[in-house]
From Swiss-Prot:
<dbReference type="GO" id="GO:0004340">
    <property type="term" value="F:glucokinase activity"/>
</dbReference>
<keyword id="KW-0808">Transferase</keyword>
<dbReference type="GO" id="GO:0005829">
    <property type="term" value="C:cytosol"/>
</dbReference>
<dbReference type="Pfam" id="PF02685">
    <property type="entry name" value="Glucokinase"/>
</dbReference>
<keyword id="KW-0324">Glycolysis</keyword>
<dbReference type="GO" id="GO:0005524">
    <property type="term" value="F:ATP binding"/>
</dbReference>
<dbReference type="InterPro" id="IPR050201">
    <property type="entry name" value="Bacterial_glucokinase"/>
</dbReference>
<keyword id="KW-0067">ATP-binding</keyword>
<dbReference type="GO" id="GO:0005536">
    <property type="term" value="F:D-glucose binding"/>
</dbReference>
<feature type="binding site">
    <location>
        <begin position="8"/>
        <end position="13"/>
    </location>
    <ligand>
        <name>ATP</name>
    </ligand>
</feature>
<keyword id="KW-0547">Nucleotide-binding</keyword>
<protein>
    <recommendedName>
        <fullName>Glucokinase</fullName>
        <ecNumber>2.7.1.2</ecNumber>
    </recommendedName>
</protein>
<dbReference type="InterPro" id="IPR003836">
    <property type="entry name" value="Glucokinase"/>
</dbReference>
<keyword id="KW-0418">Kinase</keyword>
<keyword id="KW-0963">Cytoplasm</keyword>
<comment type="similarity">
    <text>Belongs to the bacterial glucokinase family.</text>
</comment>
<dbReference type="InterPro" id="IPR043129">
    <property type="entry name" value="ATPase_NBD"/>
</dbReference>
Length: 321
């Protein structure tokens, strides 16, 4: 008889839940719920289990916030809870709550070639460290290492490191944003809101007044080639994505590959392919040769957060992935 566990991927707006086959890792019966409609994460889980008549003993849920102990208070939602209390209330034997990019990183060993698009570099080196990052509402970052037949995710808050410009244009952007918001982190330019910040800084640096645009407006105008400012912003976004990925590669020697997740890049895939992304990635001066062979992949799997939550739980309970 197939044994299933609950897996989840929870952001500021939606909670996506599914069942994971504990033998194969296959994800099934995924459903998305609006977080605004429920008073707690536990309430959403109960609704899902009732709707699917699911009897599970174990679960792993990825959440877009730092996980530092038993008490979890979501950064971009009102939900807050004790992991131990929720486990007890649900009658689970095992409940893991992990960072969303821990889950994405743990999905990488489970991905097949059709789930990836490569942007330069050679083949990944087996057993070497891996980096994963992705722009969405914010900028998520994690690393993954393989030690003693186990995958170990190294999550952190790498999206909040300083934005490090490396061209005259990027320097001007930094000065404009610093004057407006103070500290300028990488997330301030590499995210949905970050794309807006880039557009606004480009226009303001030219002494003009920016329009009140949303990220999708800027992307649409750039792709249609109807707004030079939007096109410059999107082009700069791609280059800075490359620079940031190259920094991750240097930091941990990620010859196992650098992986891009998140919902933004797939929206302008052809533009991204033709952009200065790889040039930015390799623009490391004396260490250009060091990063040239490191492959970069875009993850195009529908639910890497669910897949990785399942992988994390299976490994925690003793399986070798």
């Amino acid at each position: 008889m197939t044994k299933y566990a609950l897996v989840g991927d929870v952001g500021g707006t939606n909670a996506r839940l599914a069942l994971c086959d504990m033998t194969s890792g296959e994800i099934s019966q995924a459903k998305t719920y609006s977080g605004l409609d429920y008073p707690s994460l536990e309430a959403v889980v109960r609704v899902y289990l009732d709707e699917h008549n699911a009897r599970v003993e174990d679960g792993c849920i990825a959440i877009a916030c730092p996980i530092t102990g038993d008490w979890v208070a979501m950064t971009n939602h009102t939900w807050a809870f004790s992991i131990a209390e929720m486990k007890k209330n649900l009658g689970f034997s095992h409940l893991e709550i992990i960072n969303d990019f821990t889950a994405v990183s743990m999905a990488i060993p489970m991905l097949r070639k059709e789930h990836l698009i490569q942007f330069g570099g050679a083949e990944p080196v087996a057993g070497k460290p891996i980096a994963v990052y992705g722009a969405g509402t914010g900028l998520g970052v994690a690393h993954l290492v393989h030690v003693d037949k186990r995958w170990i995710s190294l999550p952190g808050e790498g999206g909040h490191v300083d934005f490090a410009p490396n061209s005259e244009e990027e320097g001007i952007i930094l000065e404009e944003l610093r004057a407006e918001i103070g500290h300028v982190s990488a997330e301030r330019v590499l995210s949905g809101p970050g794309l807006v910040n880039l557009y606004r800084a480009i226009v303001k640096s030219d002494g003009r007044l920016p329009e009140n645009l949303q990220p999708k407006d800027i992307t649409e105008r750039a792709l249609a080639d109807t707004c030079i400012d939007s096109r410059r912003a999107l082009s700069l976004f791609c280059v800075i994505m490359g620079r940031f990925g190259g920094n991750l590669a240097l930091t941990l020697g990620t010859f196992g590959g650098v992986y891009i997740a998140g919902g933004i890049v797939p929206r302008f895939l052809e533009f991204f392919k033709a952009s200065g992304f790889r040039g930015g990635f390799e623009d490391k001066g004396r260490f250009k040769a060091y990063v040239q062979d490191i492959p970069v992949y875009l993850i195009v799997h529908d639910n890497p957060g669910l897949l990785g939550s399942g992988a994390h739980l299976r490994q925690t309970l003793g399986q070798i992935l």
